[in-house]
Amino acid sequence: METKNDLISKTRLISQKIASTEFKTPSEIVRWMGAMQAQDYAMAKWAIGVRLTNLNEKIIDSAIDKGEILRIHVLRPTWHFVSADDIYWMLQLSAPKVKSSLKSRHNQLELTESVIAKTSSIIEKTLSDQICLTRDELRNEFHKAGIRTDENRLSHILFRSELDGIICSGPIKENKLTYALLQERVPHKKELSRDESLAELAKRYFNSRCPATLEDFIWWSNLTIKDARTAFNLIKSEFYQETRGSIKYLIPNSFSEPTLKNAAVNLLPAYDEFLISYRDRSSSLSEVNNKRTVSDNGIFYPTIVVNGQVAGLWKRIFQKNKVIVSIDFFQPPGKTTLIKIAKKVSAFGRFLGKETEFTLKTD
């Protein structure tokens, strides 16, 4: 018999486009999701890959090189992939609160507004005329100007410059990530009013992650409770509330209950939105397995998801042109599940353009 948690988790596989997708390009899926957590760069690319059919990593690299999708600090104090079409309104909406949360740390690092003004000026002059530089190359420019970059100051200087809308991710250069000037990389789009931005963010979230609660949205968006409720009220005519247990979930009016094949198996990356999008993850992750899946300091490990439930962990080991995927189930899997895992491992290899094999960890 299907439980409440089973239905919620299976519905999320559908809404997040993991079970199936109509989208064809990286920018389409990133736009659908609104923002996708991306501090683990390689895994974040796989998060896009699992939501598109027959995609390879080079296509995502191309989208990044062209500036169709950006990797930038937005919403919360961490990197996200965002569609270039959304970057300006999303930064305008979320940057002030993130900057406010960093004041104490910036005081500790002696990153005063005067220092930030100097670093911003250096960045703008150095990167003007479509110049793209790596983190280390920008570090050298700061050193020339006598600005310290130790004690994690460099990370926070660049972080602040992203929040100020000065820089964003540039094209990949010699297998290294670069920074570019945002206004040169992405022509300025039409600005949205604050209410329009709140409504748009809420629509993206609840369409792509339903069923979800207001508390889930507050966690993901990092909005204040007041702003989140305003957003909720602005879009409520397009959604309906459904109570499951004692919890109220928001679901689009146009959404229909999913039909998912038995033993649907997915190989999801670290920090995937399937888990990290929600404050309450209990519908897909039991309390016992949560301790193995999420570390005490907030690291989300790559997961094996069977029928919407986290059933194990996996990791990758690179050997020249081959990648070995180590599989660790929480409980012994059936033969059908193992066959499907083998297919998912092969799909991961095709995504990377490498041969694959997988090993099954046994106690």
Where do the protein language model's features map onto the residues?
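Glycine-rich, small/acidic residue-mixed loop/short-helix segments
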Residues: 287, 293-299, 304-363
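Short, cationic-aromatic polyanion-contact patches
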Residues: 81-87, 173-192, 249-259
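Active-site-proximal binding-pocket segments
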Residues: 198-253
